[in-house]
Amino acid sequence: KTMKSLVIWLGLSTFATIMTLPAYGQNSDIIGPSPYNYVTDSWMQTFAEEGMTFGGTSGVYVQNKGRIFFLQRGETRLPNPIPQSYAGFPASLGWNVLQGRGRVWQNVIYVANSEGEVLEIWNQWDHLFKGTNGPGPHRLRMSPYDPQNRLWLVDETNHIIYVFSNDGGRLEMTLGEKGIPGKDETHYRLPQDVAFLPNGMFLVGDGLGGNNRIVVRNADGSYHSEFGEGGDAVHQFASVHSLAMGPEQKLYALDRDKRDVKVFRQTAVLDSSDYPNYEYETTWTGLDLPLDITLGEDAAWVTDIRPPKIVKYNLDGTQDYVWNLPTEGPHMWIEMHSLSADEEGNLY
């Protein structure tokens, strides 16, 4: 069977590789056979001006192999002179760019293809993030039901969500009020993610700043309903860091601080008056500090840290395999914050 590629481009280490798992897996605690080919070769074309390098990359979304969207928390200004330890990404200098060291809010959104060639840089929107004091933009998503393929950007620090046209020419929707946190029908507090329903409605994971809720909104952005609460019970949240939809419209909500994934089943019929209605089903455990989840037809992938790793789950909640990422050397990782898959099953 031809092995898929695992194109890694996310995390505070901020570099891109394709990794050959069978060779690397001797030291990576793989459970079960891996279908991925993992080769430690540079992948992403660099485009930063002299004296600058990538920032902390927080989001990726693969529309197709010819159009892959990336979100970075600004770029990083390099010291002068550049230390010999510099290997093309800030973590090689021992920097955690999430803390903002050397950050310049520029080239936040860009588009590349599966060869790592940069196609577009959306610097016309950098002004939305200038002056941000904190992690800033957190996640990129796109609805599989949207014929316009609009790009959704969740800005955690500014409590706001932006929706752009696919070519970056228009800002088509804004949800929340920039810099104003809250817990009502129009405000969020550190929103983390969005997920999409077949009828155009969407869900907002509003759960890192104590709100501990998932907000349901109509296709036009108006408020519909919400569910979720904080607490120690298995169905309650400590945080809602990532959302993903799976088969049968099940919702998978990743709780970073409880270190688990909560699964909710859809109990209402599409287009009925009580749609959507989610009922807690089960919780997946066995994680250390999970950050993102993505679903396929028969499996789920979770990025986890402590140590940095990727975990594959079967949809019954059992772990299929786990592999750790290198934490030393030229391809080291501090964390992998997000991942996305293309039409051939390659993970980015």
PLM feature spans:
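Bacterial N-terminal signal peptides that target proteins for export
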Residues: K1-G11
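Bacterial N-terminal signal peptides
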Residues: W9-T20
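Eukaryotic scaffold repeat domains enriched in small/polar residues
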Residues: Y24-Y348
